[in-house]
Structures are given as C-alpha cells and as structure tokens.
Design a protein with these regions (language model features):
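Conserved alpha/beta enzyme-core scaffold
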Residues: 1-285
C-alpha cells in the first residue's frame, strides 16, 4: 500500500482541513481536561501511548495541587503504558483510579500505599464492559495516531488496544499526531468494525492468519475532536532484564518442559515468563 506521508513534519500529517483548525500545543490541550474526568488513553505497553499531553497534564496537576488543589483523574488504557504517561501522572499523585493493567513502579507504589484505586480486570474484557456501561462514563479519549487523512480517517500508531472503543465512547477526543512514527504504518492495521455486544455478537469472520476482515484506519466523529497536538517522539521501550528467578520444580533453574511436539504458547509478562521464553531457544525443533 502506498503511504500518504513520507517524512512530513508533525503538522503536515494533519490533512483534514477541519482538524487543522484545532491544532494546539500539549499544554493548551491539557487545559481542556478537568479534575474528576475519566480519560481513555492509547497505549499497549509504551507502544502507541501519547507522549506530550500526559506530561503536560502532569505539569498542570502538579501546579494546581501545589496551590492546595486536589486535581485527579481516572485513567483507562489498553494495557500498561510508559513513564511519559503512567509514570508522569503517578508521580504527581494525579491518578484516582486506574485500569486495566499497569507495570510502572510509581503506579504500583501508589496502589499499594492506598492512594490509587486499581481495577485488575482482564484486558480482553475492558471494551465490552465499557460498552455495557459497567465502568462508568468516559469523558475524554487521548489517542496517538500516525496521521490524519483529508476525510478525517486516522492512521493508527504502533498499537491499537482499546482505541476504537475510546474514540466511539468518549464525549471528547484529543489526538496526538506523532510524526516520529513511521509513515509505513499506514495500511498495516486491520480494524474490524463488524463486532457487536452480546447477545447480538456474531463470530469474527477470520479463519487464517493472513485474512484481513477490516480496514487500515480508525474513524471518529470529527465534531468530538477538541484538540490536535503535533508531536515528534519515539516510543520508549524498556530492555528485557536477565531472568533471575527459580522456577518451582526446575531444580533451581528455569527449564522448559520436554515435549514431543511444539504447542502454541502465549507468553505473558514478568521474570517467570521471560525465563520460560528464553529457554525455548534451547528446545529441539
């Protein structure tokens, strides 16, 4: 697929005339967020998480709370995010409630110290729960995209997560357009708009790994977009640490179970999972 952009500057990746009129700085966008709001932000690990607006919001929270305020928000994401998002907001004690998953040490301390409510819900359940209204109202979606087409379609960034649901359910939308993300992301994604909530849900029509059942773009109601923030910052990815755990039954070492045939496996997060995954390279094929 031919990409719309090459190496355009951040503002040049906003081709929709109506949305070009809403371009502003991260600080201006953060000023539109009020205490008590629930925010749905992009990000599945640090990949595709907004960078500029969360940090600007953290500065706004810190300044208001230093003057006796109690500025806090609820934060929903696709999964764990980054130091620029989770870390920045947690350091200023700005998160009242967090879901569905986190791995930031400052967030973890806030939760364990009782300063942050945490809903430890399975990632795959979040979108459906939001559609059913179980988790309450979503005020603002803050979504990183790689570009905006003339008709307002959004080129997803390096993750999708719950972005489709946030864009559809939120009252207002803030878009971070990150020109540091490769233009070649256009066409990579497969966003499926045929799903429905139970009892009207039907099987997803995908039978083979190379099937494409959706489209490469996200959609949103342009009238809900209150800010477009150009940015140029790469995802911050942490390096894997060397496994340092003893696995029960592994005689003090992490060992892969012998198997006659390789089976499908889903590798999770943490030292134990890294240890298991690292041992797979030593298994006979």
């Amino acid at each position: 697929m031919q990409t719309t952009f090459t190496h355009a500057s951040p503002a040049d990746r906003v081709l929709c005339p109506a949305l070009r009129e809403r371009i502003m700085t991260a600080d201006q966008a953060a000023s539109l967020i009020q205490s008590g709001m629930t925010l749905g932000m992009s990000g599945f690990t640090p990949a595709g998480a907004p960078k500029s607006v969360p940090q600007a919001l953290a500065r706004r929270i810190e300044a208001q709370n230093a003057n006796g305020g109690n500025f806090r928000i609820s934060l929903w994401t696709g999964a764990s995010t980054s130091a620029e998002l989770d870390g920045a907001l947690a350091k200023v004690h700005g998160i009242e409630r967090r879901l569905p998953y986190q791995s930031d040490p400052t967030v973890r301390k806030e939760i364990n110290d009782g300063r942050m409510q945490y809903v430890d819900i399975h990632l795959s359940h979040v979108a459906q729960y939001v559609w059913f209204g179980f988790l309450g109202h979503l005020d603002v979606a803050v979504i990183e995209v790689a570009g905006i087409l003339p008709d307002g379609r959004l080129i997803p960034s390096t993750s999708v997560g719950n972005n489709k649901t946030w864009l559809e359910q939120a009252d207002k939308i803030i878009l971070e357009v990150n020109s540091a993300q490769p233009a070649e992301l256009e066409g990579m994604h497969d966003i499926y708009y045929g799903a429905a909530v139970p009892p009207k849900r039907k099987p997803i029509p995908m039978e083979h790994p190379f099937d494409r059942i959706g489209e490469p773009y996200l959609h949103c109601d342009l009238s809900k977009v209150i800010a477009v923030v150009p940015t140029q910052q790469r995802d911050t990815l942490a390096a894997f640490t060397a496994p340092d755990v003893d696995v029960p039954g592994g005689h003090g070492q992490c060992r892969a179970r012998p198997a006659a045939r390789a089976a499908a496996a889903a590798i999770g997060c943490g030292q134990y999972c890294q240890c298991r995954a690292g041992r797979l390279e030593h298994r006979p094929v």
